[in-house]
Curated annotation (Swiss-Prot):
GO biological-process terms attached to the record: protein modification process
Pfam families hit by this protein: Flavodoxin_NdrI
Gene Ontology MF term list: FMN binding
Protein name per Swiss-Prot or TrEMBL: Protein NrdI
UniProt function note: Probably involved in ribonucleotide reductase function.
Superkingdom of source: Bacteria
Length: 136
């Protein structure tokens, strides 16, 4: 199985969600100067920022990560976290990344997610990778 790549701010809501999912995962560093490069296909898990608009919805660290052509070539799907207080902009980062990278938007959850969200993501990610060609 391939990995989840995720970003979590200093609030660590996304980190706590990823820990509960319990699948292999790599964190995009909070420090914008630190870079990582992945070497296998992955699903990106990303929080949404910005309070409702498109500008700023995707964290800068995630933009930098995806601007690396090697990293961008290996993304296979996106899962987004958000806050329902933002209305129509709930999980906007997932919409934007899905569109720009041409990958499926697999799931969205609020804040740290519920136990049902954790189970849905765990099951959905496993099923997603089983459907992928071996060298996808």
């Amino acid at each position: 199985m391939s990995v989840l790549v995720y970003f979590s701010s200093s609030s660590e809501n996304t980190l706590r969600f990823i820990e509960r999912v319990g699948l292999p995962a790599v964190r995009i560093p909070l420090n914008e100067r630190e870079r990582i490069q992945v070497d296998e296909p992955y699903i990106l898990v990303v929080p949404s920022y910005g309070g409702g608009g498109t500008a700023g919805a995707v964290p800068r660290q995630v933009i930098r990560f995806l601007n690396d052509p090697h990293n961008r070539a290996l993304i296979r799907g996106v899962i987004a976290a958000g806050n329902r207080n933002f209305g129509d902009a709930f999980c906007r980062a997932g919409d934007l990344i899905s569109q720009k990278c041409g990958v499926p938007y697999l799931y969205r959850f609020e804040l740290m997610g519920t136990q049902q969200d954790v189970e849905n993501v765990r099951k959905g990610v496993n099923e997603f990778w089983q459907r992928q060609p071996q060298n996808a």
